[in-house]
Amino acid sequence: MTHKRYASSLSAGLLATTCVAGLLLQANGARAQQAAEAQAPASSTTMMQAATVAPAQSGQAAVVQRLVQQARFWMQQHQYENARQSLQSAARLAPDSVDLLEAEGEYQSHIGNRDAALDTQRRLHQAAPGSTYESQLNDLLHEQAISQPDLAHARSLAASGHSDQAVEAYQHLFNGSTPTPSLAVEYYQTLAGVSGQAGTAQDGLIRLVKANPSDFRAQLALAQVLTYQPGTRMEGLQRLQALQKYQSSAPVEAATAEKSYRQTLSWLPVTPETLPLMQKWLDAHPSDSALRTHMAEPAGGPPDKGALARQDGFKALNAGRLSAAQAAFQSALNLNAKDGDALGGLGLVAMRAGHNEEAHRYLEDAIAADPKNAAHWRPALAGMAVGEEYGSVRRLIASGQTQEAEQRLMTLARQPGQSEGATLMLADLQRSTGQTGEAERNYRAILARNGDNPIALMGLARVLMGEGQESEANALLSRLGGRYSDQVQQIEVSGIMAEAARTSDSAQKVSLLRQAMTKAPDDPWLRINLANALQQQGDSAEAANVMRPLLTSPRTPADYQAAILYASGNGNDTLARRLLAGLSPDDYSPAIRTIADEMAIKADLASRLSMVSNPTPLVREALAAPDPTGARGVAVADLFRQRGDMLHAHMALRIASTRNIDLTTEQRLAYATEYMKISNPVAAARLLAPLGDGSGTATGSAMSPDQRQTLMQLRMGISVAQSDLLNQRGDQAAAYDHLAPALQADPEATSPKLALARLYNGRGKYGHALDIDLAVLRHNPQDLDARQAAVQAAANDGKDNLAMQLAQDGVQQSPMDARSWLGMAVADRAVGHGDRTLADLRRAYELRLQQLKISRGDAIGGDETQATAPPTANPFRRDAYGHALSLGAPPGENGYSTAGSVPEISDQMLSSINGQIHTLSEDMAPSVDAGLGFRVRSGTPGMGALTEASVPIVGRIPLQAGTSALTFTATPTFLTSGHLPQTGYDIPRFGTNLFALERNLQNQNNSAEHRINTDTIGREAGVAPDVRFANNWVSADVGASPLGFTLPNVIGGVEFAPRVGPVTFRVSGERRSITNSVLSYGGMTDALTGKKWGGVVTNHFHGQVEATLGNTIVYGGGGYAIQTGHHVQSNTEVEGGLGANTLVYRNRKHEVRVGVNLTYFGYKHNEDFYTYGQGGYFSPQSYFAATVPVRYSGHSGLFDWDVTGSIGYQLFHEHSSAFFPTNPVYQALANGLAGVSTAELSLESARYPGDDVGSLVGGFDGRVGYRVSHSLRLDLSGRFQKAGNWDEGGAMISAHYLIMDQ
């Protein structure tokens, strides 16, 4: 049955298709529009299609349409399994629906089943030949056959201004036919730039808009193309104005339309018709001084074609399209041969192209033509004079030798005529390396001499914007005039980005970057900054949506660069390689070149790893080459990390980081970042220690702003990681010491606050943890990490209703994020909904897997200030105990494998979810266990010797979502002690055989028929039943010793084990059989009297406290017991013990612990004998032992094991004991026989002698398990122990079978 919350989240997902229709349409064209129409009023076009497909639309047809729309929504979200389920449901209702057939073909195409898609295409042609549905499926199949490198080449030609060649390249992709829907807009935009083709481009865009009026991207392109021609410019303005109204449904297009509208206004002449449009713009934008100046031109004056051409030229120059820029400037020069700006522009084009002589001539002509603006060109001309020197400086900067470059520039600035140019370059360099103070002084020095220098004005404005001094920065920018409007907007955007970089509030950061996106929607660097901010906020799905245009359809080299950085940063090497293939090596930035080198290193190493069994030599070989940036070491380590081989990942980083004594800053940051990826914050911190605060005082060289930002983020991550590690070990005090610097450095940062909450959780102060989590969540309700933490804290604190409400809000808010469903799983588990918990976990697993594929593509109370303010002192130092560690199955580590990266291995969240699913599935599944065990105990045959065989059969029924269980056990048990030796020493020491011997001796005829049989053998057989209930803190059982034994007993017990923070208190009371011998366990019958005796039970009361100190577990406890039996002397016992064990080695595959145990117990009576009235169990009056146990556990593949060995020393003392302690008459008779020594009877005394023993003690206990299948596990165990006056060994083979795997 579908849960209500799942249905509501699905509806919310469908509703989202309307809210983000503009973004989805860019990627999927008309098909996404069909999915969105589920929530929008039907247009006339939709109604006509509906009439064609279903003339009388019944209720069933409406359901089919809804299911198909759901499928399209899921396909847009890359949720193909959900899409398949929706399509299957629709097919059961209307298998021949043409709408369904088109959607099925789309689904088959998306999952790569092209043959099936082609078959569906043929069926669709037969059902509805020539229909829109057939056309859409044909277009989709054609698009997916297009060569991505060829498409990237066409886009590159268009971006560089070679429109003619770009159009030819596009037409080659389309085989000369009509462009496919997803590429039609960009094709017609490119075609509009070809001479004489503007009309054709307009017609094509008009057809697109008519076919799909909600395609905002096509609407925008049409409006822009119309403004390029004077005859259609007013119509274009009207369309641009209309598009600005779609801020909610198409924010990117609306923002671009506003920018284009303003640009078009500057192209219009000032006439009575245009003046109201300009005035209306000024009313809304009173600070637009450039438009105000334009309006001051004489009314009715003709448009300045030269100015338009110059604007186009500088715009193309700024975009790097040199051919287009040269053509535009030449066009302006043809209109006016003395146009200084056009001449200067041509000079800049020549400089960019490396034609220095030509550039020098153009720049001199520009100064001569317009002396008033000579200052615009003198810096460039001055730079030409010393071009080689400046070239060498640029090469130094490109290679990272910024200090030497600064010295060169300072020298240049002292040369005649070079002060301004060299100082400008120096200031720019200082600004880029974070020396903002020095850069500001140099910019101001230039402006003091030349107040109109545009480069200095813009450089100083960038510095001031970065420091938050917006007022002065805006005042400087206002002095630039209209020709620098694009640069001004870029600087304004950079100011917003700088403000976003300064804040640690993730919500504010996202808000600022979204604001910047409205100003520069095409800026790829702004887009990747927003995506990164969203990821830091926890909204990876939205981050992927923001980056999707760049990842799927990059157009410019900058688009490719940003997309490559994002793909690589998210571990998607496949996507990064594909994007690299579409980018010319000439357009590689240093960062992109580093990524390309990493990809090449990984590819080469991966191909060779498949041919070796031991990768160590290959690791050393791969790292033998120089690694100045750290890229090589990171690439090798990252390859192994992605494969889950952390051993060789650590090895690679260790080799790389120790090859040179003096590592560069770049190397340290690179290696430390990779160390953090493989969860080694200690090594990362050690690498970063020499960098100090990043000012250069520790290393001698200042770090760039980006490097300082990376250093700050790494240090915060290290503090949080080390705190979490110590918290897991139970040492919250030391954890807080590591976390405190991060809390103090940035009190607004979210991750240290959540880490502090985890410390309080670890200490058991769930209420305080909840207060912190809720305070973070109130500040940013979108923070899924905070929400997940709050759900867990509420559940820990017993506030199940609050946990459920928080979890449901998270699912409703972010239904496509795995963390929302992990929170839901915690809430459902807290209220005992096991099936729902399992469904939540599986949903989280699917979503996380898909995310990796995409990126690899009660009222809430409490005072927020108190909750989030870091305490002034360490609140965890007051207590000297920590969080108890479990000695259960160790965490796994995958060893080296030549296989490719497995998501479950390489992603920590996915691995954790998989483990939870596996554990919960087992906890919730009824199970049956069956085994065969043997036990052998030393001693005299017929008395202390014991051989036991048992066949335990266990049935388990889970309760309360697997947190509790009811267990039923039946154990057939067989005991034997062997034949009593027929000697004069042994016979009288069992039962009442002493008197039988005496009677036999007195029987004068001594005939066999009058003799009493003393040749006894102890045998018992029976079945032991037991019923047990257990949960996390209490267990209780009731049962019996084997029914069928001579003297069965009712047994059982109860244990309470509440946990208060990291301390566990155990209190138990139980009644158990003493299984030392056949006598104590099952009871026996005396041959002479026929009386039964034995069957001893101990009634034991015990208390114990367990805690941890870091990796060390300590415990202490004691108890009291009363032993009773049938015709056996009652006894009492006191006992106590202390111990500790510590972790000495652990990786993800093995664990070793070493400990020490001190044991004491003592009984009132010594009853370790077998005459009538004795109990037959080891019961010294004092026993001391000190042992050292060593435990080794681990797993590999389908095997797991757990072995413990111990050795130590024991001292014990036993008092003497009467032969017949419960019968004075028997004892008196025995006293009378004391001293007899014959072949038939040897009795020195009627009391057993006492003893004092000191000896070694030790043993082992081991288990090996093998998982045959998901439902069946086999275990083989064995043990041996030497203690007291006995040795005991045993073995068992058992099977565990899940009856019903949930």
Swiss-Prot record:
Note the InterPro entries from the entry. BCSC_C, Cell_synth_C, TPR-like_helical_dom_sf, TPR_rpt
Its localization reads: Cell outer membrane
Output the Pfam families linked to this UniProt entry: BCSC_C (PF05420), TPR_19 (PF14559)
Q: Which UniProt keywords apply?
A: c-di-GMP, Cell outer membrane, Cellulose biosynthesis, Membrane, Repeat, Signal, TPR repeat
- Pathway(s) per entry: Glycan metabolism; bacterial cellulose biosynthesis
Query: From which residue to which does the signal peptide run?
Result: 1-32
PROSITE patterns tied to this protein: TPR, TPR_REGION
Known Gene3D superfamilies for this protein? Tetratricopeptide repeat domain (1.25.40.10)
Give the bilayer topology. Peripheral membrane protein
- For whether the record's keyword set contains Membrane, the answer is yes
Query: SUPFAM superfamilies, from UniProt?
Result: TPR-like (SSF48452)
Q: Keyword Signal on this protein?
A: yes
Q: Where are the TPR repeats?
A: 64-97, 147-180, 306-339, 340-373, 572-605, 716-749, 750-783
Protein's GO biological process: cellulose biosynthetic process; UDP-alpha-D-glucose metabolic process
What is the disulfide pattern of this chain?
Answer: none
Q: Name one GO cellular component term.
A: cell outer membrane
Q: What does this protein do?
A: Required for maximal bacterial cellulose synthesis. It may be involved in the formation of a membrane complex for extrusion of the cellulose product.
- Per the similarity annotation, which family is this? Belongs to the AcsC/BcsC family.
Protein name in UniProt: Cellulose synthase operon protein C
State the organism named in the record: Komagataeibacter xylinus
